[in-house]
Design a protein with these regions (language model features):
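N-terminal leader/targeting segments
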Residues: 1-80
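Generic alpha-helix detector with strongest preference for long hydrophobic helices that associate
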Residues: 5-8, 12, 83-87, 91, ...
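Mixed-charge, low-complexity intrinsically disordered segments
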Residues: 70-96
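Short, compact, well-ordered microdomains
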Residues: 90, 95-136
Length: 136
C-alpha cells in the first residue's frame, strides 16, 4: 500500500520498458515515412503525432494527435467558459473532428505498416491510439 493509504498501479519491468521504447521509436519512424510529423512525448505540444510510453504494467505505447495551439486553445477556452453540450460551438466541433479523423488515420497507417493497434481506452487516454506491437 502507498504512503497515502491506497495501492499504486504496478509499473512495467525494465525489460518491458525497453521493448516499449523500441516500439515507440519504430512507431515514430513509420508515421514519419507516411509524411506525418511524429515526436516522442518529450516534445509534446508540437503539432503532429505525439508518441509516448506509459510506464504502467498495463500501459504501452500511445499516439495522440496534437493540433496547432490556436485550435486547441480555442476549444478549451470555450469549454471553460461553459457551453451547452447540445449545441456545441463550431470551434469545439472542428477540434473534435480533427482529433477523430487523425486518430482513425493513425490507426490505419500504423496497421498498414505492420503494427498491431487499437483505440486506447477513452476514459484513461482520450483519443489516443494504443500501439500493442508489430505484426511484421
Amino acid at each position: 500500500m502507498g504512503e497515502h493509504g491506497f495501492d499504486l498501479p504496478p509499473k512495467a519491468t525494465r525489460e518491458v520498458m525497453d521493448w516499449r521504447e523500441e516500439l515507440a521509436d519504430r512507431t515514430c519512424e513509420a508515421l514519419a515515412q507516411a509524411g506525418l510529423p511524429a515526436h516522442r512525448v518529450d516534445l509534446q505540444g508540437r503539432p503532429g503525432a505525439n508518441v509516448q510510453v506509459d510506464p504502467l504494467a498495463d500501459g504501452g505505447v500511445l499516439v495522440e494527435w496534437g493540433t496547432q495551439e490556436e485550435l486547441a486553445t480555442a476549444a478549451v477556452d470555450l469549454l471553460e467558459s461553459g457551453v451547452d453540450p447540445s449545441n456545441l460551438p463550431h470551434a469545439i466541433r472542428h477540434y473534435e473532428t480533427v482529433q477523430t479523423c487523425m486518430r482513425d488515420a493513425i490507426l490505419q497507417i500504423l496497421a498498414s505498416a505492420g503494427f498491431h493497434v487499437a483505440r486506447a481506452d477513452a476514459h484513461t487516454y482520450g483519443s489516443a491510439v494504443h500501439v500493442k506491437g508489430r505484426t511484421l
